[in-house]
């Protein structure tokens, strides 16, 4: 393999100004679009020696056949052009979004002569105002039903409206007071439009203003003894308050913002958007991003912003994000432009709307208070959405079958890997060394066959892998040695095995008797070499071996100098990544429980410090690490622990 690509431009040919670049393949298809503050500095990163590039970047660069660039006047112009080209070319190596077009919205068609309210999944009506997205259609219908009591806007179809005009008879909603009846002349088109604009204003966050206005009208009607009008205003107030009650109050009344949470791993990211208007959550949007190249969180946020506000949605003045991207100022400028472009939206008084949509858009990271709590909730929802996405994907039988076939072909296996075992090692500064074994059969976890290993001594991870694989493979021999009867659950080796112990160990051996089609270790070439040594010494045959390296997601085979590259977002890589992550989780959980057990034992040996006080100490400080950092005076603040006992705890932890 050549050390660089043949189409690499000379350094002097690439300008140092801001610009946008495109990589194309032999058919001139655009593979990747990127922007740069300094084109020469950015593009030089792609033309380093291939062996030093991230694997996904290397794949893109070697797939491409040419690169071209366009110089612009500023970073902001680069951002705009990048956005335009990504939309135009849909490059496969840029972040790919799984769209959320199926979400229902509440729409008010202000662009029509007689506006109407409707629930829709399409956002194509010109001049319409959209609210949402909502997670359930019934939630919108409940809100609309309450709102029509206060703002009786037309909600019928065009056919029903024309029939009412021709017959002079209103529909049922007009008879029960949930439509003002513009079809039969009960109100003029202008009066009906004002009702629709009030509906929009309330949904946009001006709810308190309308409640105050209706309350004042109710008092005036009662003062003039027009009790029928006062009752109508009272019912309208109750309906609006009920509609407001369906939206969670999270911030002050005058706060408009969008909060974004992102949960991501090497292959995908889930995005959660909370739409807050007037201090209330007015909509929730969730979608999944397929990551092709290894993008940082800041770069991912930039792409998320472009996706979220590419349509008719006007960004609020404040947007909460997990981290600020490097070009936050330019991104804010672009969002401000989108905000001003979407002002006016079909209302009769665009100047008023422009006033509401004026001002710069600013990206922020919430540090404390209610906004930080909202941002944390968005992030938690995003992480849960990512887990749900991965779980649903892994439970898809067709996807699992394709994954087996692809893994079999990529690794040169005779049979599909219907049983896979994965091993991971965990330790804390070479202490409490443990390992995990997880089992997937037919692409699904078999938790009853998971095993945990305790490793007394080990020089490094490769030695630990060798020990664990040796112990596991010993169970596959026809006549296992005494060492193989050691429980693979962290217990110490019993030197004097009586008949009952041998029988129990034999039962455990039978549980280990099923050989894996594919044995995976968490790691690269060194770990795979250690596992291969254990496999060869065991004499066991018919077991294929592979390793998956962290971060790069490369699959290594024994004796190979180059990794096997499974396609990004493929079902095969997803399955291997999932079993690796499960092994890591299982090892970490066991390692933490060992540390907690050890520290509890150490503390329990201190005279006067019983189980209740040990529990109180750990509860007060939250973790062993925080307890170790605490001074004797801080430890003494714990209920039931005096200065003398605190000093003993401090000294004992300092000795370890």
Curated annotation (Swiss-Prot):
Residues 208-243 form the UVR domain. SUPFAM superfamilies: C-terminal UvrC-binding domain of UvrB, GIY-YIG endonuclease, RuvA domain 2-like. It comes from Leifsonia xyli subsp. xyli (strain CTCB07). It is found in: Cytoplasm. Residues 16-95 form the GIY-YIG domain. It comes from the Bacteria. InterPro entries: GIY-YIG_endonuc (IPR000305), GIY-YIG_endonuc_sf (IPR035901), GIY-YIG_UvrC_Cho (IPR047296), RuvA_2-like (IPR010994), UVR_dom (IPR001943), UVR_dom_sf (IPR036876), UvrABC_protein_C (IPR050066), UvrC (IPR004791). One of its GO terms (biological process) is nucleotide-excision repair. Interacts with UvrB in an incision complex. SMART domains: GIYc (SM00465). PANTHER family: UVRABC SYSTEM PROTEIN C, UVRC/OXIDOREDUCTASE. Keywords: Cytoplasm, DNA damage, DNA excision, DNA repair, Excision nuclease, SOS response. It holds the Pfam family UVR. The keyword DNA damage applies. The lineage of its organism: Bacteria, Bacillati, Actinomycetota, Actinomycetes, Micrococcales. The UvrABC repair system catalyzes the recognition and processing of DNA lesions. UvrC both incises the 5' and 3' sides of the lesion. The N-terminal half is responsible for the 3' incision and the C-terminal half is responsible for the 5' incision. GO terms for cellular component: cytoplasm; excinuclease repair complex. This is UvrABC system protein C. One of its GO terms (molecular function) is DNA binding. Belongs to the UvrC family.
């Amino acid at each position: 393999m050549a050390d660089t690509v043949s189409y690499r431009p000379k350094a002097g040919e690439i300008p140092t100004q801001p610009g946008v670049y495109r990589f194309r393949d032999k058919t001139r298809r655009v593979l990747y679009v990127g922007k740069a503050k300094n084109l020469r500095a950015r593009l030089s990163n792609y033309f380093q020696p291939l062996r030093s590039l991230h694997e996904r970047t290397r794949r893109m660069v070697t797939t491409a056949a040419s690169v071209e660039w366009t110089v612009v006047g500023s970073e902001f112009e680069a951002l705009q052009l990048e956005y335009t080209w990504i939309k135009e070319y849909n490059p496969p190596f840029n972040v790919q979004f799984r769209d959320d077009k199926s979400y229902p919205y509440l729409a008010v068609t202000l662009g029509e002569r007689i506006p109407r309210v409707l629930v829709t999944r399409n956002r194509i009506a010109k001049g319409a105002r959209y609210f949402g997205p909502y997670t359930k259609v019934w939630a919108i219908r409940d809100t609309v039903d309450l709102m029509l009591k206060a703002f009786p806007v037309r909600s019928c179809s065009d056919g029903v409206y024309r029939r009412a005009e021709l017959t002079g008879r209103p529909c049922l909603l007009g008879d029960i007071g949930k439509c003002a009846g513009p079809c039969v002349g009960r109100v003029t088109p202008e009066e009906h439009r004002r009702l629709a604009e009030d509906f929009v204003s309330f949904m946009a966050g001006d709810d308190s203003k309308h409640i105050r206005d209706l309350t004042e009208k109710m008092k005036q009607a009662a003062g003039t003894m027009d009790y029928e009008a006062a009752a109508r205003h009272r019912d309208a107030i109750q309906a609006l308050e009920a509609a407001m009650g369906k939206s969670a109050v999270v911030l002050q009344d005058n706060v408009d913002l969008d909060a974004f949470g992102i949960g991501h791993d090497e292959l995908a990211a889930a995005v959660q958007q909370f739409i807050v208007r007037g201090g209330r959550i007015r909509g929730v949007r969730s979608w999944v991003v397929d990551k092709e190249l290894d993008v940082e969180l800041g770069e991912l946020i930039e792409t998320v912003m472009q996706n979220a506000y590419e349509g008719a949605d006007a960004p609020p003045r404040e947007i909460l994000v997990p981290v600020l991207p490097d070009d936050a100022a330019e991104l804010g400028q672009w969002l401000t432009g989108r905000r001003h472009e979407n002002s006016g939206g079909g209302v009769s008084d665009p100047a008023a709307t422009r006033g509401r949509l004026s001002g710069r858009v600013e990206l922020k990271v919430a540090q404390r208070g209610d906004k930080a709590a909202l941002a944390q909730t968005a992030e938690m929802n995003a992480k849960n959405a990512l887990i749900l996405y991965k779980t649903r994907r892994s439970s898809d039988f067709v996807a699992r079958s394709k994954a087996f076939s692809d893994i079999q072909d990529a690794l040169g296996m005779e049979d599909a890997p219907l049983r896979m075992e994965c091993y991971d090692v965990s330790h804390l500064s070479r202490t409490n060394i443990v390992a995990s074994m997880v089992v997937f059969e037919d692409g699904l976890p078999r938790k009853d066959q998971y095993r945990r290993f305790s490793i007394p001594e080990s020089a490094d991870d490769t030695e630990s892998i060798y020990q664990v694989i040796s112990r596991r493979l010993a169970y596959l021999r026809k006549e296992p040695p005494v060492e193989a009867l050691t429980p693979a659950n962290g217990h110490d080796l019993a030197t004097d095995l009586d008949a009952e112990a041998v029988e129990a160990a034999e039962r455990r051996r039978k549980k280990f008797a099923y050989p894996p089609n594919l044995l995976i270790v968490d790691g690269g070439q060194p770990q795979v070499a250690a596992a291969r040594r254990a496999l060869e010494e065991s004499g066991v045959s018919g077991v294929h071996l592979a390793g998956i390296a962290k971060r790069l997601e490369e699959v290594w085979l024994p004796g190979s100098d180059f990794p096997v590259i499974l396609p990004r977002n493929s079902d095969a890589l997803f399955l291997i990544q999932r079993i690796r992550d499960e092994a890591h989780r299982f090892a970490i959980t066991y390692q933490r429980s060992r540390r907690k057990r050890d520290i509890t034992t150490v503390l329990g040996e201190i005279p006067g410090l019983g189980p209740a006080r040990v529990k109180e100490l750990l509860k007060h400080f939250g973790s062993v690490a925080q307890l170790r950092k605490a001074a004797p005076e801080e430890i003494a603040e714990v209920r039931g622990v005096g200065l003398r006992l605190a000093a003993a705890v401090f000294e004992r932890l300092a000795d370890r």
